Amino acid sequence: MTKQEKAENQEKPTEETVEETPKKETPFEPVMEADEVEETTEAQAPVEEADDKLAELQKKYDAMEDSFLRSQAEIKNIQMRNQKEQANLLKYDGQSLAKDVLPVLDNLERALAAEATDESLKKGVQMTYDHMKHALEDHGVKEIEAQGQAFDPTIHQAVQTVAVDGDQKADTVVQVFQKGYYLKDRVLRPAMVVVAQ
């Protein structure tokens, strides 16, 4: 080839096509130098310590909050129990006084049952009895109905048993020796009774 042919070849574009492969874009990864890596590790250490302390403090906080809530609930329960006990004390406040007065009421009943020659004396005893019974009823003391009722060991005290007679039913109160009384819903004194067997 002559020089002229070489020049022509250079000027003519060749028909060969070269396919270019597209380059993939890689994400930018900063290259850290050794000093920068050490600084990052040193900076992360206090952050990790702070995270650990925070987690520990959170656990302590949760435990204290739980303890606080339990204590509050216990205090509320104690207060409610206290109120209930006070209500019961007020409800049954006169129990010992009523127990002491019941024998006096029994004696007044016996005096009224006895034959009296002086009508004015009997009338005075009756008035005293009525007044005392009314005062006791005002404070929640009421008589236990026993005569003719089925025997109930929670409110009756059997002092004697007798054979069933005529139209009587077994386990029925046939006679009352001493009246029994309630104080509100509590048995103050059981009735002393005779029971048919």
Curated annotation (Swiss-Prot):
Keywords: Chaperone, Cytoplasm, Stress response. It is found in: Cytoplasm. Its main location: cytoplasm. InterPro entries: GrpE, GrpE_coiled_coil, GrpE_head. SUPFAM superfamilies: Coiled-coil domain of nucleotide exchange factor GrpE, Head domain of nucleotide exchange factor GrpE. GO terms for cellular component: cytoplasm. Gene3D superfamilies: 3.90.20.20, Head domain of nucleotide exchange factor GrpE. Residues 1-50 are annotated as: Disordered. One of its GO terms (molecular function) is unfolded protein binding. GO terms for biological process: protein folding. PANTHER family: GRPE PROTEIN, GRPE PROTEIN HOMOLOG, MITOCHONDRIAL. NCBIfam families: PRK14140.1 (NF010738), PRK14162.1 (NF010759). Participates actively in the response to hyperosmotic and heat shock by preventing the aggregation of stress-denatured proteins, in association with DnaK and GrpE. It is the nucleotide exchange factor for DnaK and may function as a thermosensor. Unfolded proteins bind initially to DnaJ; upon interaction with the DnaJ-bound protein, DnaK hydrolyzes its bound ATP, resulting in the formation of a stable complex. GrpE releases ADP from DnaK; ATP binding to DnaK triggers the release of the substrate protein, thus completing the reaction cycle. Homodimer. This is Protein GrpE. The gene is grpE.
